[in-house]
Amino acid sequence: MTEWTGKRYWLIGASAGLGEALAHKLGRLGAEVIVSARSEGKLAALVNELPVSASYQTIDVQDIDSIRAAVKAVGPVDGVVYLAGAYWPFGAKEWEPEHATTMIDVNLTGLVRVMGEVVPDMVKRDAGHIVITSSLTAYRGLPKSIGYTASKAGTLSLAECMHADLRKTGVKVQVINPGFIRTQLTDKNDFK
């Protein structure tokens, strides 16, 4: 079993939904939690609710300068959990290129940017825990899920490649593939 007490975990994409819930869980387990997202107000409110030492650092995963500033401000961590996500439901018949591009940029390319700034330090220290949030949709295409499913297939593949490259080091890589969780993102669905 993992010992969380005294560990520093950075949750990126933690202002709501799964990230917010995980911040509470890790806090109850004794971890020092650093939460990040774009919304400073939501992050500040979350930090005030957490039961242990917690702080926040704003980050925009679409902006490499914002990522680099956040990495510098946060400093070395025992673990990083990438939960940042964007979602708009639409399918091939009503293609929305701007939304598709944003989903891929936040969900996949943002992950690549963050890992590029975090992983080298973990490899140098031969220590770290990386958790990447993908989705069950990464395994099979779904109606009205063009950009999201493609981006999550990419996050799954990236996580598997990182695990293959780092499995014999002190850096542990995990991927989680949640099913349907009701969040502000999934509330956009109009299931029939």
Question: What do the PLM-derived regions correspond to, one by one?
Answer:
Residues A164-K192:
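SDR active-site lid
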Residues L50-D65:
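Rossmann-fold cofactor-recognition segment
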Residues M115, S151:
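Active-site helix of classical SDR
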Residues K93, L142-I146, N189:
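Active-site loop immediately N-terminal to the catalytic Tyr-X3-Lys motif
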Residues S15-A16:
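Conserved glycine-rich cofactor-binding loop
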Residues S135:
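Residue(s) in the substrate-gating loop at a strand-loop-helix junction
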Residues L29-L46:
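Conserved glycine-rich Rossmann-like NAD(P)H-binding loop of the short-chain dehydrogenase/reductase
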